[in-house]
């Protein structure tokens, strides 16, 4: 039985904002009826609207252009606080160099820590702790000049020694064991003056600027016990499995945060999360799905991409999935457009490989429909592989992530037409991390894999045969060669083509059943504004504000 009956469309109107978001204000029933009659037209026009929004560019600016959606009169005010519901607690350690397994943890720590560079809302790499940089022609030596006057949250000035310590630690230069895979290519980090450091790489890397977002921390603290960064918010406290508190950092070098305090409340039940929004127990929640925001009358809803690849991720070493024909059969048995329509009310962007549309230089739209739904073809492939009576397997899904539970339920129904029997095992997030992601003790799972940066390698590196994050156990000499070619060239065009070759191999070899970049909805109380989507999985609380009364 399907998880629910496909209901009526979400009752809201969409307005284009300058930064490419869609601001949604829930409307009354009479307006909703008129909107429903126009749904088909809206779906077509949305495609045009998206292209226009992309052209607009720019981040959210409370004082700037607000054409296209209503904004209350008055000025954004500094001060106040917000309570944000999150569906899972952060990692047990908030050491920024080791707490990278959870996307949710990285999402929050984005507000606390900064690297030499950071990503802006348009996906550009811009200086943060660094003020400027130069790169040699071989792309194997990067020189950074530090920004003057930056302070850590403990009040100390940021020095070149702190930067050298942070990057050396993250790259494992003393231990030989990198803590952060993105900077494992660093061969040496040296200070050449009071404000200048030179980083030499073991191999050329034209994407290195996208990797040097690794947190800069003080050299004289224990990062396993103290959470000290340079971001717009400082860590103020935590109650495990209950809440995390961030406070505004008054000496932040950049644009100050509007809010004085952000409390992240752990609510591990999706229904309770929605009820908490409706009752006002919390003011904001991110990563909601269409069926949830239907219920949130009177709240401001912002829609944007998740910038993560949702798929039925397959353990390629598990028999029968070690046979490419079986994996391809799964691809033919799944109708991802139906998944969008049934589980997401049509919201989302279909994908065909491990790349999402926001990384437009690398995204390959022609792979989206590489496997047209064909249950008969799926049965044929299973028979060729020696399974004429079909196969059975278990899909392990994080129980707190309703969008993935819903997707898995639709998939289970679809697979039956191809003679495939699947059952769902819902587990808590901690169990999923330990058993699936780290332990690789699973057959298949439905999740979304995000990119912690804007480099293609952030999404594709994990599928190398020997990569520690290759939890699906995908192994392909062809893929490894293509990836090596991509990261070793200094020719941007050749690199892009090599990364696209990697994407094509993942699709052709059916490493996973790729589905979509899900639409993500952020709900905020009616007096909160300013949320900005980035082309990666982060939540920027510094831009959220209230209007002065």
Where are these predicted regions, by residue range?
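A structural "hinge/loop" feature
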Residues: 87-106, 129-130, 156, 208-215, ...
């Amino acid at each position: 039985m399907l998880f629910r009956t496909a209901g009526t469309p979400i009752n809201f109107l969409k307005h284009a904002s300058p930064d490419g978001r869609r601001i949604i204000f829930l409307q009354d029933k009479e307006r909703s009826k008129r909107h429903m009659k126009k749904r088909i037209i809206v779906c077509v026009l949305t495609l045009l609207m998206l292209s226009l929004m992309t052209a607009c560019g720019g981040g959210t600016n409370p004082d700037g252009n607000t054409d296209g959606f209503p904004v209350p009169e008055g000025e954004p005010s500094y001060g106040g606080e917000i309570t944000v519901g999150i569906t899972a607690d952060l990692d047990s350690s908030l050491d920024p160099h080791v707490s990278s397994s959870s996307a949710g943890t990285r999402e929050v720590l984005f507000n606390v820590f900064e690297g030499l560079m950071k990503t802006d809302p348009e996906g550009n790499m811009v200086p943060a702790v660094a003020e400027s940089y130069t790169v040699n022609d071989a792309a194997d030596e990067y020189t950074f000049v530090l920004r003057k006057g930056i302070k850590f949250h403990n009040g100390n000035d940021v020095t070149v020694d702190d930067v050298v310590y942070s990057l050396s630690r993250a790259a494992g230069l003393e231990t030989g064991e990198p803590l952060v895979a993105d900077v494992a290519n660093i061969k040496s980090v040296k200070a050449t003056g009071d404000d200048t450091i030179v980083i030499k790489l073991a191999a050329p890397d034209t994407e290195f600027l996208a990797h040097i977002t690794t947190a800069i921390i003080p050299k004289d603290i224990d990062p396993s016990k103290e959470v000290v960064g340079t971001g717009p918010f400082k860590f103020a406290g935590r109650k495990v499995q209950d809440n995390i508190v961030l406070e505004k950092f008054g000496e932040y070098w950049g644009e100050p945060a509007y809010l004085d305090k952000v409390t992240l409340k752990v609510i591990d039940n999706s229904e309770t999360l929605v009820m908490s929004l409706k009752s006002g127990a919390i003011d904001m929640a991110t990563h909601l799905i269409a069926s949830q925001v239907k219920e949130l009358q009177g709240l401001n809803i912002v829609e944007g991409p998740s910038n993560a690849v949702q798929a039925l991720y397959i353990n390629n070493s598990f028999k029968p999935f070690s046979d490419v024909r079986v994996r391809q059969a799964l691809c033919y048995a799944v109708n991802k457009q139906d998944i969008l329509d049934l589980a997401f009310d049509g919201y989302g962007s279909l994908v065909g490989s491990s790349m999402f549309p926001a990384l437009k230089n690398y995204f390959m739209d022609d792979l989206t429909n590489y496997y047209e739904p064909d249950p008969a073809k799926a049965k044929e492939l299973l028979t060729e592989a020696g399974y004429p009576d079909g196969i059975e397997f278990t899909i392990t899904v994080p129980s707190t992530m309703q969008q993935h539970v819903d997707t898995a339920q639709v998939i289970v129904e679809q697979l039956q037409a191809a003679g495939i029997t699947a059952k769902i095992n819902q587990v808590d997030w901690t169990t999923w991390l330990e058993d699936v992601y780290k332990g690789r003790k699973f057959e298949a799972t439905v999740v979304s894999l995000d990119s912690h940066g804007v480099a293609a390698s952030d999404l594709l590196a994990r599928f190398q045969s020997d990569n520690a994050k290759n939890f699906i156990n995908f192994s392909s000499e062809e893929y490894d060669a293509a990836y090596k070619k991509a990261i070793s060239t200094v020719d941007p065009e050749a690199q892009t083509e090599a990364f696209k070759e990697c994407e094509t191999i993942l699709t052709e070899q059916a490493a996973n059943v790729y589905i979509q970049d899900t639409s993500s909805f952020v709900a905020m109380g009616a007096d909160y504004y300013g949320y900005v989507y980035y082309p990666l999985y982060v939540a920027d609380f510094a831009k959220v504000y209230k209007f002065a009364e």
